[in-house]
């Protein structure tokens, strides 16, 4: 499904050039749940942003099926993101002035190919994450765990081919973090492909495969023991 070939990402300023990703080669199979770990500044978020086409590689190829995303222009990438990707952020990134139902519907805002009733799709996404009873509430009326579940509903409502989660439990207490991980695990069991950045070894162990990064490189890869 996904193949990164010799990906490099360099940032240049007037005084120094920083290399965030160094010769990264990675494959992610359809239906996989991959966890990315490593110390702060190792390139985890840059790798996730590259997978999300938010950050463009300086060199290398990013194959998504038969498409080389590294060669696409910004307009084509924006269309690709809207159709194929779902994002879950550590800070939730919900819009305060919108209800949870309206926030969830934002996952369809830039989709022109959505079949069926959009309201039903939104309701189904909220039900999947156990937040339907909060549909008419605003983000500030929800706990952190509920807000993250709403953010996951927004990510999955468009039925993306790939879900990218950046520290999805980072702002949550243990109980809410476990609930979010249970949701992600259930989504993966249902066929969703997920790539997650985390600092939690126990949460990484819930993924099917884990890679470790250091200084912009993938230094280890291991499948979960069954």
Which residue stretches match the model-derived regions?
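ABC ATPase nucleotide-binding domains
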Residues: 225-226
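ABC family nucleotide-binding domain
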Residues: 1-213
């Amino acid at each position: 499904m996904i193949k990164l070939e010799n990906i490099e990402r360099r940032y240049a300023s007037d005084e120094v050039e920083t290399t965030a990703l160094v010769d990264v080669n990675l494959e992610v199979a359809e239906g996989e749940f991959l966890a990315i770990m490593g110390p702060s500044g190792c390139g985890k978020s840059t790798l996730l942003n590259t997978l999300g086409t938010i950050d463009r590689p300086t060199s290398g190829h990013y194959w998504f099926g038969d498409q080389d995303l590294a060669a696409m222009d910004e307009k084509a990438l924006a269309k690709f993101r809207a159709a194929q990707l779902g994002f879950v952020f550590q800070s939730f990134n919900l819009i305060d002035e919108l209800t949870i139902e309206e926030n969830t519907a934002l996952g369809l805002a830039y989709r022109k190919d959505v079949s069926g009733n959009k309201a039903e799709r939104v309701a189904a996404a909220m039900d999947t994450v156990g937040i339907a009873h909060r549909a008419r509430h605003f983000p500030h009326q929800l706990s952190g765990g509920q807000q993250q579940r709403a953010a996951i509903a927004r990510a999955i409502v468009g039925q993306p081919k790939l879900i990218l989660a950046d520290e999805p439990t980072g702002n949550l207490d243990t109980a809410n973090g476990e609930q979010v991980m249970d949701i992600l695990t259930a989504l993966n069991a249902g066929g969703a492909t997920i790539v997650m950045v985390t600092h939690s070894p126990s949460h990484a162990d819930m993924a099917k495969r884990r890679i470790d990064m250091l200084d912009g490189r993938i230094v280890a890869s291991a499948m979960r023991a069954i």
